[in-house]
Amino acid sequence: MKKLLIIFLTFLFLTTFANSQSRFGELTEIRDEKMRGKDNQWVRPHPGPFIWNHIEKEKGNFNWEETDKYVLYAQEHNQTILATIWPHANWEQKSCKRKKAKSPFGKKFTKYLSKPCSMDDYKTFLLMLIDRYDGDGSNDMPGLTKPIKYWDIMNEPEFKMFFKGSEEDFVEIFNFSSKVIKEKQPDAVIVMAGAAGMFPENIKYWKSALPKIKDHFDIANIHHISGPDGQCDKELWVDEFAALLKSVDVNKPIWLTEAMTCGPPVKAWVNAFLNGAELIIDVGVNAPGKKMSKKGRKKLNKFIANYDGFTSIKSISEKKVEFTYKDGTKKILEF
């Protein structure tokens, strides 16, 4: 079935995007010079500084030093931030004796990954976070010129390494967060917590969860990380994810916000775009796991530099696509 779909797309598929801003980005870690992202593109700090435990280490005591660093750097390099919100604070989870979890990011993260004990305390943090970076001129970060508009609520909740809670807990946190953000920042764009691939267990989780959150996010979100066996999906899961969304009556743009490939990256990126991805965020040169070859990285960077900003992509043949731009110009890529 998948082979038939690819053949069909080869001759017919056309994807049109709403605008022509950058279609590319990277996961970033500001402490690593090679992981700070490219100018004029998207960045998704990961895990990033938007962690309740980092910002409010004690109740009522907010420290914005780390978050401000990321925002200021992004402004200086004309990067658009996709901010991942992590709703966990050690002090808060201790208040109702939550069990500790193994941190997926070591000591720099948090010791607890459960649902907040007090949604009111979480709301206070969330409102403070949005208020500082929404750009409304009230209580903004000093020097803020490029507000944060895109908010990614949580990360791969179907994996216990990132969230120690039930599906119902996730749904409650997600919908609650979305409502709070939208009320405070009406032009905010809510990005679904990234699905950790499209393996059977992922599909089962999201087939149940998506109908419960679909009215509370604007962008659907999928991740593709190569497994321990080093295997990758040719379309970086975008085709399976699109099919899942359709099966639960979700009609939203698709972003691929963690892209790791073990084959030719340009081909994989093109296949993902052809299957409906509007934005692809690379995991970055120093991300854990399998590394992209230097040759592959060079080709990917050249592809991004030469073809970014397109408004639509059309498959012409099995190894040729056509990109269209806002001014009507077209570019052909053979890969």
What role is predicted for each listed range?
Residues T28-I30, P45-P47, A83-P87, D152-N155, ...:
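A cross-domain feature marking catalytic cores of carbohydrate-active enzymes
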Residues N19-D140, K146-I148, D152, E158:
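N-terminal substrate-binding region of glycoside hydrolase catalytic domains
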Residues L4-L14:
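Sec-dependent N-terminal signal peptides
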Residues T261-F335:
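Aromatic- and carboxylate-lined catalytic core of secreted/periplasmic carbohydrate-active enzymes
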Residues I55-G60, K97, F163, Q231-C232, ...:
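Short, flexible/disordered intra-domain loops and linkers
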Residues Q21-F24, K38-W42, E76-I81, K146-K149, ...:
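Loop/turn elements at helix/coil->beta-strand transitions in domains of secreted/extracellular proteins
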Residues C96-F217, N221-A243, S247, C262-N271:
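Active-site cleft segment of glycoside hydrolase catalytic domains centered on the general acid/base Glu
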